[in-house]
Amino acid sequence: MPLEVTWPFPQCPRLGWRISSRVVMGMVGSYSYLWTKYFNSLMVHNQDVLLNLVDERPQDTPLITVCNHQSCMDDPHIWGVLKFRQLWNLNKMRWTPTASDICFTREFHSSFFSRGKCVPVVRGDGVYQKGMDFLLERLNQGEWIHIFPEGRVNMSGEFMRIKWGIGRLIAECSLHPIILPMWHIGMNDVLPNETPYIPRVGQRITVLVGKPFTVRHLVNALRAENTNPTEMRKTVTDYIQDEFRSLKAQAEALHHRLQNHT
């Protein structure tokens, strides 16, 4: 299924593009910062781990953050956990794969979301498509990518098997990314998955930042064994899923404790 709009990213972005992208990222980030921290109650556990990785990791070390998907505005709301100055630093902020059938259906929408470092991914087109290739290039430049590995908003709250796209990005990356799992609770109270889609105030949000890890040892072993690409993606994805799953119960316990104390 082809993308409904022209590919939004220029090969060599001009000054006007970079300035407009910085404005979009900064303004949306500022909204998220104010809305989650001041109009709602935000509790972040192990926040310094994320902040330090955004600021201080080596230039040749990509970062992949993964978290659960509760609401259609988890991104950008989740980035209320960052420092205000980070939200305005275009070079440090994340790229994220974004459903093309939602955010890239018109040229105006495409222009806005692409300047917000959202990359169109066509559902059903698999792990080999232009958006995924673009994200892989960003990783190879040492940049930060945020992924909702469930692939869609999870309204049931049950743990879903994560998609293989993340496995491809890691398996084919020429560098060795740091992977940071996170789990949040309460975003679907801030923006419920029902009409009217208007963000609410006075809600409690818990964000648990997990322990960073790499799969360098696993990828090197799979390459040494000449593992075929499909099996390699699956093995890497399964490993990440195990690390990711362990956060769910911890985050729920922290969130319930917060509710009981208020």
UniProtKB/Swiss-Prot annotation:
It comes from the Eukaryota. One of its GO terms (molecular function) is 1-acylglycerophosphocholine O-acyltransferase activity. Its main location: mitochondrion. It is a peripheral membrane protein. InterPro entries: Plipid/glycerol_acylTrfase, Tafazzin. Keywords: Acyltransferase, Lipid metabolism, Membrane, Mitochondrion, Mitochondrion inner membrane, Mitochondrion outer membrane, Transferase. Residues 82-92, 155-190 are annotated as: Mitochondrial targeting sequence. Its EC number is 2.3.1.-. It is an enzyme of class 2 (transferase). Acyltransferase required to remodel newly synthesized phospholipid cardiolipin (1',3'-bis-[1,2-diacyl-sn-glycero-3-phospho]-glycerol or CL), a key component of the mitochondrial inner membrane, with tissue specific acyl chains necessary for adequate mitochondrial function. Its role in cellular physiology is to improve mitochondrial performance. Pathway: Phospholipid metabolism. The enzyme was named after a masochistic character Tafazzi, once popular on Italian television, apparently due to the difficulty encountered for its identification and characterization. Disruption phenotype: Morpholino knockdown results in dose-dependent lethality, severe developmental and growth retardation, marked bradycardia and pericardial effusions, and generalized edema. A motif (HXXXXD motif) lies at residues 69-74. It is found in: Mitochondrion outer membrane; Mitochondrion inner membrane. It comes from Danio rerio (Zebrafish). This is Tafazzin. One of its GO terms (biological process) is positive regulation of heart contraction. Residues 19-35 dip into the membrane without crossing it. Belongs to the taffazin family. Pfam families: Acyltransferase (PF01553). At 10 hours post-fertilization (hpf), expressed ubiquitously, including in cardiac progenitor regions, with strongest expression in the head area. By 24 hpf, highly expressed in the head, eyes, and tail. By 30 hpf, expression is restricted to the head, heart, eyes, and the region next to the yolk corresponding to endodermal tissue. At 51 hpf, expression is restricted to the heart. It catalyses: a 1-acyl-sn-glycero-3-phosphate + a 1,2-diacyl-sn-glycero-3-phospho-(1'-sn-glycerol) = 1-acyl-sn-glycero-3-phospho-(1'-sn-glycerol) + a 1,2-diacyl-sn-glycero-3-phosphate; 1-hexadecanoyl-2-(9Z,12Z-octadecadienoyl)-sn-glycero-3-phospho-(1'-sn-glycerol) + 1-(9Z-octadecenoyl)-sn-glycero-3-phosphate = 1-(9Z)-octadecenoyl-2-(9Z,12Z)-octadecadienoyl-sn-glycero-3-phosphate + 1-hexadecanoyl-sn-glycero-3-phospho-(1'-sn-glycerol); 1'-[1,2-diacyl-sn-glycero-3-phospho],3'-[1-acyl-sn-glycero-3-phospho]-glycerol + a 1,2-diacyl-sn-glycero-3-phosphocholine = a cardiolipin + a 1-acyl-sn-glycero-3-phosphocholine; 1-hexadecanoyl-2-(9Z,12Z-octadecadienoyl)-sn-glycero-3-phosphocholine + 1-hexadecanoyl-sn-glycero-3-phosphocholine = 2-(9Z,12Z-octadecadienoyl)-sn-glycero-3-phosphocholine + 1,2-dihexadecanoyl-sn-glycero-3-phosphocholine. One of its GO terms (cellular component) is mitochondrion. The HXXXXD motif is essential for acyltransferase activity.
